[in-house]
Amino acid sequence: MSDALLADARRALEHMPAVLEALLSGLDHEAARTRPAPNEWSPVEIICHLRDEETEDFGARVRVILEGAAEFVKIDPERWAVERGYQEASLPEALAGFRARRQDSLRLLASAPSELLRALGASRPLGRLGPLSGLDLVAAWVAHDRIHLAQLAGALARNWASRWAPLRSEYAGPIPYPTSV
């Protein structure tokens, strides 16, 4: 990844908290906790996931590479959602936590020598992916943000359409993500 691409990735990571705050501004307590389907996350669960992934997945894994540690720690985000009570969390507090953790992550990336980010990661590969460089993780970090941004937008659109039934919203076009997964 060139320095220009790394700079683009840092900017994308920097903008994510403001994008989320704008998207979720004014969302009431009920809407923050509405799951578009029983096996899908609500908006507050998505934000809690992003907050915790910030330091326990992407940030932690970049640190492993920068510090030359031996391996990545195993994570279980699905378990975190239940054990940490994501569904009952405060959306404003989760957003603030995400923003603070993202600022810490951006400071870490700003101080990281690019040659260390380019180095291949832990001596034990990450599952089927094999060894990863810090730059691989930065690219995945941006993709992860965007995957969950799309998930959040789809959840909000589907929840909105359900909440306002029997009004018909199909004139807007197809709502992202089918109601049955």
Predicted regions and their residues:
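Acidic/histidine-rich alpha-helical segments that form the ligand environment
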Residues: 16, 21-23, 79-120, 136-151
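Short, contiguous alpha-helical
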Residues: 33-77, 120-181
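Alpha-helical bundle segments that constitute or directly flank the non-heme di-iron/ferroxidase center
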Residues: 2-30, 53-67
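Amphipathic, non-membrane alpha-helical segments in soluble helical-bundle scaffolds
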Residues: 3-13, 40, 91-95, 135-138
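Short coil/turn linker and secondary-structure boundary residues
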Residues: 4, 27, 41, 86-89, ...
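A short small-residue
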Residues: 1, 78-86, 125-128
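Short helix-to-loop capping/linker segments positioned immediately adjacent to catalytic or ligand/cofactor-binding
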Residues: 30-35, 92-95
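A short secondary-structure junction motif
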Residues: 23-30, 69-72, 112-115, 155
